[in-house]
Amino acid sequence: MKLPKLSAQKKRPEEIIAELKRHPAIAPLIEGAEVIEYSAHVIPEAGYEMMPKLTADGLMVAGDAAAMCLAAGIWLEGVNFAMASGMYAGEAAVEAIKSGNCNASGLAGYRKRLENTFVLQDHKKLRHAPHLVLSDRVQHL
């Protein structure tokens, strides 16, 4: 659910989840279940166009902080991007430290790794998908 719609309903996220749990299609599936833990946070819907610069001197940005999430309503993908970008950041850090160059140019291997894998390839390929899925035309079918 997009933030403006949530705000217009004047309901907290946990109230909406409670309503969902009472829905006739859901309630029988979770009858007798116990909530062990609850958490919620805003998921970035920025996509490829809003992705920040991924490196600077002594710095690499990964996961949600780098808008590496494909989020469009019921479709959400991001844990795989966070894990992979973290791994590639670690590899690039080792490489930069070994070379003695931890400035942006020394960390360029990070972006190269991302570009050569599903992380940035998927973001580039699907960069228009969130706009389509979240469009008024699709949301009001």
Model-based region annotation:
Residues 7, 50-53, 73-81, 101, ...:
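Alpha-helix capping and helix-loop boundary segments enriched in small/acidic/polar residues
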Residues 41-73, 138-139:
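FAD-binding beta-loop-beta segment adjacent to the flavin cofactor pocket
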